[in-house]
Amino acid sequence: MNANELMIGDWVRRKTNGEYHRVCEIFQRPEHGWCYKEKFGLINELSDVEPIKIGHDILIKNGFEVEDGAGYVREDAYGRSVIVSTWDCNIKVVHNYDIEFNKAFHWTFHVHELQHVLNACNVQINI
């Protein structure tokens, strides 16, 4: 992964052992290139991480519900809904603004990309 793909708080998976880590800091070291620090202070190289594919378990754990014909849906008190299409493995974020209905679409395949979209709606996810 590249440093410009990540934000603080993103979830990634280490290639060497499959562990999930949450990025707490991103920095560059001359001898190792781009690195990240996870919550326990351990430092790992970005070359040793990969994105986490979005799957059923992660979506259910984060409050999404299976809805026939739409895939997975999550709505909050502000009228925001997130629809995950089951037929093409893409995520579409639909946002309701006050009285007007506007659609803002963002297609994604990985957990960190979903985090970026949901952060804009002030929604955090867990792994």
Where are these regions (language model features)?
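A generic structural signal for residues embedded in beta-strands
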Residues: 13-14
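Short beta-strand-centered aromatic/proline hotspots
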Residues: 18-31
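Intrinsically disordered, low-complexity, charged/polar segments
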Residues: 40-65, 107-121
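Amphipathic, interaction-prone secondary-structure segments
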Residues: 65-90
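Intrinsically disordered, low-complexity regulatory segments enriched in Ser/Thr/Pro
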Residues: 82-109
